[in-house]
Each structure stands twice: as structure tokens, then as C-alpha cells.
């Protein structure tokens, strides 16, 4: 078991690991590009592109949230080195989502987009998630961490929890029009599990600290 864990850690630290995972993260984009070029997006390709890019945004947000639990549970610290790249891919797909909506639904008409944001709550919520995700992407580099300080940087990046909630609400309202919530419940369960683990882990750490302090006090 120990040898297997060491081998996994060694592979994740290999110079080829990041480029390989980068290429894997690009696969959804490559497929969408090919499907659009070869006319395989169905009867409504514009809607398919808007929907698919939104789905992949939410999936990557879930993947980012899963990094810390997986790192702790599997005792694989090297997983943390991929979190920044995964977060940037979440931003990449949300930009594609926004561009698809702005182009295919709104024709890049800024006034129409502004009216739509003001008129439809689920568009407002989705746009708010994009706005909040932007500073996270902009400060995902070492220079930003150094400039902001680690504590302020960590506080800013806790916005990912709010972003996940807004993304779920956006998806829920979008699905409400079709009265189809199956996928919404799946994503909500995943996010709840990942956030619930964080609450439990924080509580467990606090309890261990209290126990350790009590043990020191006895001695």
C-alpha cells in the first residue's frame, strides 16, 4: 500500500503530469469545437454550446472543490499542484459559456445583454458567478499571492464556495423552465458532500487541538 501511494505521488510530481492533465482538461473544448465544425450538435447547436460550456464550468468548479478532500483522504499532497490549473480551466469554460450566450442568444448587443441580466434572475445569478470568479483567476499566480499576502489571498479564494452556490442556483432556475431537476440534484449532492467534508474536517482538527492542549495541560 505504501509503495503504491509513493508511486502515485511520484507520478503526480513527474514533469509530464501537468501537460498531460492540461490536455485532458482541453478535451471537452476540443470535442465541442469538432462537433460544431462537423455539425454534430443537434437541431439547436447554439443552445447545445451554451449548455455544454455551462455544464463544464460547473464540473470544473466541483473538481476544484474535490482537490483538498482527495489530497487529505488519499494522503497525496502532490494533488495540490494541479488546483490552480483546474481553477483556471473553470474560468476558461465560464468565459466560453458567457461568450456563447452573448453571441448566439444576444448577438453581442451590450444593451440587450444588460436588459437580460436585469430582467431574468437566473442570468443575473450566472453573471454574478462569472464576476466573482474573475478576481480568483486574476490572482491565481504566485506574484498575486506575494502582493496580497497569504491570508488575504486565501480569504479572497474562499469565494469559490459562494461561486459554487451561485452556479447551482443558476442551473436550478435554468432547469425550472423545463421542470427537470435530476442533474441539478446530482451537482447539489456533490457540492454538499465536498463542503460538508470541509466542515467535518475543520471540526475534527479543532477537536484534536483541544485534546492535545488538554493532554499537555495534564502533564
From Swiss-Prot:
Its main location: membrane. It comes from the Bacteria. Part of the MsrPQ system that repairs oxidized periplasmic proteins containing methionine sulfoxide residues (Met-O), using respiratory chain electrons. Thus protects these proteins from oxidative-stress damage caused by reactive species of oxygen and chlorine generated by the host defense mechanisms. MsrPQ is essential for the maintenance of envelope integrity under bleach stress, rescuing a wide series of structurally unrelated periplasmic proteins from methionine oxidation. The gene is msrQ. GO terms for cellular component: plasma membrane. Its cofactor is FMN; heme b. It is found in: Cell inner membrane. Binds 1 FMN per subunit. Binds 1 heme b (iron(II)-protoporphyrin IX) group per subunit. The chain crosses the membrane at residues 17-37, 88-108, 121-141, 153-173, 184-204. One of its GO terms (biological process) is protein repair. Keywords: Cell inner membrane, Cell membrane, Electron transport, Flavoprotein, FMN, Heme, Iron, Membrane, Metal-binding, Transmembrane, Transmembrane helix, Transport. It comes from Polaromonas naphthalenivorans (strain CJ2). Coiled coil: none annotated. This is Protein-methionine-sulfoxide reductase heme-binding subunit MsrQ. It is a multi-pass membrane protein.
Amino acid at each position: 500500500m505504501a509503495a503504491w501511494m509513493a508511486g502515485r505521488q511520484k507520478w503526480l510530481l513527474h514533469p509530464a503530469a501537468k501537460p498531460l492533465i492540461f490536455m485532458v482538461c482541453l478535451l471537452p473544448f476540443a470535442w465541442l469545437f469538432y462537433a460544431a465544425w462537423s455539425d454534430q450538435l443537434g437541431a439547436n447547436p447554439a443552445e447545445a454550446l451554451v449548455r455544454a460550456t455551462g455544464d463544464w464550468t460547473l464540473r470544473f468548479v466541483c473538481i476544484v472543490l474535490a482537490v483538498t478532500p482527495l489530497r487529505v483522504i488519499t494522503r497525496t499532497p502532490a494533488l495540490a499542484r494541479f488546483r490552480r490549473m483546474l481553477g483556471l480551466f473553470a474560468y476558461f469554460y465560464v468565459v466560453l459559456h458567457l461568450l456563447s450566450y452573448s453571441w448566439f442568444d444576444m448577438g453581442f448587443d451590450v444593451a440587450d445583454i444588460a436588459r437580460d441580466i436585469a430582467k431574468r434572475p437566473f442570468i443575473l445569478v450566472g453573471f454574478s458567478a462569472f464576476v466573482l470568479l474573475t478576481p480568483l483567476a486574476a490572482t491565481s499566480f504566485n506574484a498575486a499571492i506575494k502582493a496580497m499576502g497569504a491570508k488575504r489571498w486565501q480569504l479572497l479564494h474562499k469565494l469559490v464556495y459562494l461561486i459554487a452556490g451561485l452556479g447551482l442556483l443558476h442551473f436550478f432556475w435554468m432547469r425550472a423552465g423545463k421542470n427537470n431537476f435530476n442533474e441539478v440534484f446530482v451537482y447539489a449532492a456533490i457540492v454538499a458532500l465536498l463542503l460538508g467534508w470541509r466542515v467535518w474536517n475543520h471540526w475534527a482538527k479543532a477537536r484534536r487541538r483541544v485534546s492535545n492542549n488538554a493532554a499537555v495541560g495534564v502533564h
